[in-house]
Amino acid sequence: MSVLAAVVLCAGKGTRMKSEKAKVLHPILGRPLCAYPLKRALELGATSVVPVVGHQAEAVEKAVRGLFPDAPLRFALQREQRGTADAVRSAEEALKGYSGRVLILYGDVPLLRRETLEALLAAHDQAGGKLAMVTTTLEDPTGYGRVIRDGGKVTRIVEHKDCTPEQRAVRECNAGIYSVDADFLWKALAEIKPQNAQGEYYLTDLVEMAAKRGPVGSVEADATETAGVNDRVELAARARVLQQRINEAHMRAGVSLQDPATAYIEEGVTVGPDTEIGPSVTLAAGTVVGKGCTIGQGSVLHASTVADGTVIKPYSVLEEARVGERNVIGPFSRLRPGTELAEDVHLGNFVETKKARIGKGSKANHLTYLGDAVIGSGCNVGAGTITCNYDGVNKHLTELGDGVFIGSDTQLVAPVKVGDGSYVGAGTTVTKNVPPGSLAVSRTPQVTKEGWVATKKARQAKARAG
């Protein structure tokens, strides 16, 4: 395969999205639309990738650089919206001195497969001409440019409005994806004339110009694969296709999805074999789940790591958490950023953690908040325990040693330490460090008044009779 550069058109406003946000920044499975064609170009080994920006140029550039910080990006600006040919021409300066193949992609076409683009580049090499293109066959080609052939050879693209009745019967359409020789591309773009009253320049003219200089290569792709996004209905439709692809890939790799139609799994998620994922689970980008895990119904994992053999019970939420092997989490647990759990940890219903490191075999099974905490191994934290970590200005650390037992309804007022093997009685407010092997109790002594209820009722009856 020849040396490759790529131009990705990201300048459009996307008026039909009815949004203040640039169209290519609208998310599809957790990533902006434009991330998908950009990723494809990089997968193919493009040595220069030129996103052409226009509408909200700074926002688009910032987003793309954030997604691909180490990529060979060279941004180009289309100052006015004057058609696709003008947009590509905006990239000429960014590719000055380059003489290889230029792959032209659209920032709002997220479903193109790598294999299709590899076939396009191979078709370009095989044809030996100036240009190769992707075509697609549509049941209803109304509105699309038709691929006109002569003896099987591509000769030009005719827009629907300009087609003769015979040409309108053609169902092979232009998908708008091209591989073009750079030297030909820049010269041909300079020759293209505006096609309408708005002074717009269209790339489709390139095909006829290339056909006059040699054979035009072509490869056919499924219509779903080449479909763009113009409004939010189409955005949702493309997302469904992409989600199905992702879910099927996981299942073929040994992952069980109880209800593939409701499992929301973004790109950039890794799941090990023999893991079972329940209905309506969300696995966001950056999440890694080991083998033999169970992710229960309605659970949400954002950029979290779950080691082998762990069970996440239904409706638990993990955000940038690190979970060790054989943990049992939930139901209804929330692990916030900075949570790190060792092996065999149990966190039960309505337990919330934040910046908490919890050692091997420790348990907090009910109604507990553990924030800014370091908890040793083999600890038991009773129901209703709270680390009081915030004084109104600063956060403070709570430390529990190994083998600590914390009774129910305990408040640990940070900064505070409870030493190895210590016990804290139920209902205690711990404000001072507890030495190893100690018992800390701060409850008010119980007072029992026998016969008090009868005395109270008699007094109330007398008052009513008054």
UniProtKB/Swiss-Prot annotation:
Residues bound to UDP-N-acetyl-alpha-D-glucosamine are 23, 78, 83-84, 106-108, 145, 159, 174, 230, 336, 354, 369, 380
| Recorded catalytic activity of this chain's protein | alpha-D-glucosamine 1-phosphate + acetyl-CoA = N-acetyl-alpha-D-glucosamine 1-phosphate + CoA + H(+); N-acetyl-alpha-D-glucosamine 1-phosphate + UTP + H(+) = UDP-N-acetyl-alpha-D-glucosamine + diphosphate
- Give the start-end ranges of region Linker: 233-253
Positions that bind acetyl-CoA: A383, N389, Y390, S408, A426, R443
The residues listed in the UniProt record as binding Mg(2+), with positions renumbered to this chain, are D108, N230
Pathway the protein contributes to = Nucleotide-sugar biosynthesis; UDP-N-acetyl-alpha-D-glucosamine biosynthesis; N-acetyl-alpha-D-glucosamine 1-phosphate from alpha-D-glucosamine 6-phosphate (route II): step 2/2; Nucleotide-sugar biosynthesis; UDP-N-acetyl-alpha-D-glucosamine biosynthesis; UDP-N-acetyl-alpha-D-glucosamine from N-acetyl-alpha-D-glucosamine 1-phosphate: step 1/1; Bacterial outer membrane biogenesis; LPS lipid A biosynthesis
User: Any note on cofactor binding?
Assistant: Binds 1 Mg(2+) ion per subunit.
Q: Which Gene3D superfamilies has this protein been placed in?
A: Hexapeptide repeat proteins, Spore Coat Polysaccharide Biosynthesis Protein SpsA, Chain A
The catalytic activity of this protein is classed by the Enzyme Commission as: 2.7.7.23, 2.3.1.157
Q: Write the record's keywords in alphabetical order, separated by commas.
A: Acyltransferase, Cell shape, Cell wall biogenesis/degradation, Cytoplasm, Magnesium, Metal-binding, Multifunctional enzyme, Nucleotidyltransferase, Peptidoglycan synthesis, Repeat, Transferase
UniProt record, GO biological process: cell morphogenesis; cell wall organization; lipid A biosynthetic process; peptidoglycan biosynthetic process; regulation of cell shape; UDP-N-acetylglucosamine biosynthetic process
Which Pfam family, just one, is annotated for this protein? NTP_transferase
Which residues of this protein are catalytic?
Answer: H366 (proton acceptor)
Q: Which InterPro entries match?
A: Bifunctional_GlmU, GlmU-like, GlmU_C_LbH, Hexapep, Hexapep_transf_CS, NTP_transferase_dom, Nucleotide-diphossugar_trans, Trimer_LpxA-like_sf
Entry GO CC: cytoplasm; membrane
Q: Please give the cofactor(s) recorded in the UniProt entry for this protein.
A: Mg(2+)
Q: Which residue ranges are recorded for the region named Pyrophosphorylase?
A: 1-232
Q: Where is this region: N-acetyltransferase?
A: 254-466
- Cite a single GO MF annotation: UDP-N-acetylglucosamine diphosphorylase activity
Lineage: superkingdom: Bacteria
Localisation per UniProt entry: Cytoplasm
Does the UniProt entry include the keyword S-adenosyl-L-methionine?
no
The task this protein performs is described as: Catalyzes the last two sequential reactions in the de novo biosynthetic pathway for UDP-N-acetylglucosamine (UDP-GlcNAc). The C-terminal domain catalyzes the transfer of acetyl group from acetyl coenzyme A to glucosamine-1-phosphate (GlcN-1-P) to produce N-acetylglucosamine-1-phosphate (GlcNAc-1-P), which is converted into UDP-GlcNAc by the transfer of uridine 5-monophosphate (from uridine 5-triphosphate), a reaction catalyzed by the N-terminal domain.
In which family does this protein belong, per the annotation? Answer: In the N-terminal section; belongs to the N-acetylglucosamine-1-phosphate uridyltransferase family.
* Subunit structure comment from the entry: Homotrimer.
Record-given protein name:
Bifunctional protein GlmU
**Species, as recorded:** Myxococcus xanthus (strain DK1622)
